[in-house]
Every structure is written in structure tokens, then in C-alpha cells.
Amino acid sequence: VLVFTFLCRIVGVDGSSMKTTLMDRDLLILSVLPYTPERGDIVVINRYTKEPLIKRVIGVAGDTVEIDEEQHRVRINGVLLDEPYIHVPTYPEGMAGKTVEIPDGKVFVLGDNRVASLDSRSIGLIDEGDILGKAVFRILPFDRIGSIYEES
């Protein structure tokens, strides 16, 4: 019990914003140890809605993020981001024609299902302090148990 209180939590996925990486009703183990978010991390954010959000960190402090309106892809520091987990185009929504510079203590997050995600395109940058933790492992459903990160 102490392990789950101080080191990790179990969280459920509610919705399709991280599809196909995470599906509605997946159960995840969330590490709640203090850490510095990195690009590609899947994190749980608590602040912007009644329920916590599960999103992928796309940009970190010092990065410049833009959404290429012609290719419908994300650019980090001018370079197209390799996102093998994306299966739909990335539309700029509220970021059309904008470049976002990420200051210290903030991150830029997106859902993997970009057409159905409330994320930094609409709610802005996320304070690192609003990140509850990093998702590290899927425990349900049993046929998808294991790492939620693609092997490189």
C-alpha cells in the first residue's frame, strides 16, 4: 500500500484523445516521483478540466514548437518531429501561423489522436507543477499489458 501511495498510482483512461497508443478504459501505472518531463513522455495533468488529462509531452523548456500547416505535422526547433504513434493529421487549431517558445517550468502537450484532443493548442502551455506523474505501464486490458512506449 505504501508503494502505491508514495511511488505510483493507478489511473484510468477516459476518452479517445490518446488513441491508438491508449484506449478508453485502459488502466495505467503512473509514477508520481518528482522528475523533469522529457519529449515523448505520456503524463497526467491535473488543473485544466474537472478530470485529469492524459497527454504526450511534445515540447520542453527551451524548445520552439510550431505546427506546419501544409504538412500537418509538428516542428520542434525547426525540425519535423518523428511521431510514429500518430495516425491522423495535426491541425493547428488555435496555433495557426504561430510559433510557441517554451519557457522554463512549462511543457507543450498534445494528444495522440489530434482530431479529438483538448491540449496545448487550445489550453496553452502546461506548468510542470500541474503534472501528476508519468504513465509508465499498462495493466489493463490483459491483452495489451506492458509498456506504453514504442521500442526504438
Language-model segments: residues:
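Soluble "head" domains of membrane/secretory-pathway proteins
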Residues: 6-12, 19-152
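Single-pass alpha-helical transmembrane signal-anchor segments
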Residues: 1-3
